[in-house]
Amino acid sequence: MAEVEALPGLKQPVDDAGLLEDANQVHTLVIPSGHIWRVELSSDEKLSLKVTAGIGEIFGTELANNVEYTFWDWKFGIYAVEELEIEWKCPQLHDRELSIVENTTAHNVYNLHFALEKMRSSTFDGPRIMVVGEKNTGKTALCRTLCSYAIKNKPYQPMFVNLNPVEPIFSPPGCVTAVPISSTLDAQLPRWGETMTSGATRLHGKQPIIKNFGFETIAENRSLYKLVTKKLFETVSERLQNDSLVHRSGCIVDSPPLENCDDEYSELVEAIVGLRINYLIILCNDNDKGREIYTKVSKIVNTYVGERLLRVPTMAGVFEKDDVYIRAQQRAAIREYFYGDTRTVLSPYNLGCDTSDITVWRPKSVLQGENTNLDTLEVAPVDSSTLQYALVAITYASRKSDSEEVLQAPILGFGLITELNEKRNKLKILLPVPGRLPPNAMILTSFRYLE
């Protein structure tokens, strides 16, 4: 027994062996068929579990039996397709009441999946669906599940498109992305998996198409958002046209929350037109608010999708994501881009250079009082208040390119300005790979990361 010194008069014996035993204590949980174990973990909580009997899945990805999975800093659900027995250990969860709820929307998801399968098998033009809804309705969960189901038993490669810059999926935050889902998604990662830049990984890495928006909310610059998504739509359409397997597999599009769109839902309309969406799925419950949302959306999109607007209830077991959780996920995505995670450790390169060696552009924001020429860039001042700890997108455009060329250029990758000395005109920038600093223009994002 060790004794911990505290405030005078407050000495409490602590059983070190007991603490260690509690941390490694294995618990057994049986989840009834058709139910979800809702798991909520903070950044300092680690859950290890192993399926010992039954069939369970996380967002459509089946968990292998007798394989240990590790989770942290995530809110997710484990669905028991049939009665599921799990061995788990997590000292922080030990004293909590576990949340197990019935999956009341499983049949809706299955019906959608089988309808999409029928379309893929009956025509060369695969289904192009977009999921819309308000925050915390399960849009991303439904998209991920449908992608996982599509590749489970057939050699399909559906194109997943993320139009919500808040969600860092296969990219740092502030991006809109598209990626053909050709293999199993990593059930342990909220960001769906790892990309080809992570090197050797246990699961096949994905190669996403990434367009940098740079802001968290669409409202900060709607003109720029529409310009960036238009470029994404063009690239996705070209890929669908040139890849017959992806074309037949179709598109699954995760839209930004309805609250983030303008009153006319013009962002949704442009996505419907740009990606030639033929089915729109709206997540809302059958109550007064849900019917009001459905009516408003249907009036606006009726011209484009007609009767192919489907109402599906809000996904069962969905979590509410507050700002603290969202910031934690964005921070984790930036960290993993440069450093990897506990299973795939990366070694970024910290490079020193003169401030005169870089040219950083920044988009305008209505939150800063900008109201004109919002779809153009301006040169950012090279000072600590602007660039310190900033995430920057490195473009293919040269440093001498003008605003329009930089805005239209594809993204080479991302860098993180870790230090800036204004007196010496020196800075340090973290890059994913070693080598010289590319002589390319950079675009400042609104995201910061401090170790």
From Swiss-Prot:
Example GO molecular function term? polynucleotide 5'-hydroxyl-kinase activity
Q: Which InterPro entries match?
A: Clp1 (IPR028606), Clp1/Grc3 (IPR045116), Clp1_C (IPR010655), Clp1_C_sf (IPR038238), Clp1_N (IPR032324), Clp1_N_sf (IPR038239), CLP1_P (IPR032319), P-loop_NTPase (IPR027417)
Q: Where does ATP bind?
A: 75, 136-141
Q: Which UniProt keywords apply?
A: ATP-binding, mRNA processing, Nucleotide-binding, Nucleus
Q: Name one GO biological process term.
A: tRNA splicing, via endonucleolytic cleavage and ligation
By sequence similarity, the record places it as follows: Belongs to the Clp1 family. Clp1 subfamily.
Q: What is known about its subunit structure?
A: Component of a pre-mRNA cleavage factor complex. Interacts directly with PCF11.
**What this chain does, per the record?**
Required for endonucleolytic cleavage during polyadenylation-dependent pre-mRNA 3'-end formation.
Q: What is this protein called?
A: mRNA cleavage and polyadenylation factor CLP1
The source organism is Candida glabrata (strain ATCC 2001 / BCRC 20586 / JCM 3761 / NBRC 0622 / NRRL Y-65 / CBS 138) (Yeast)
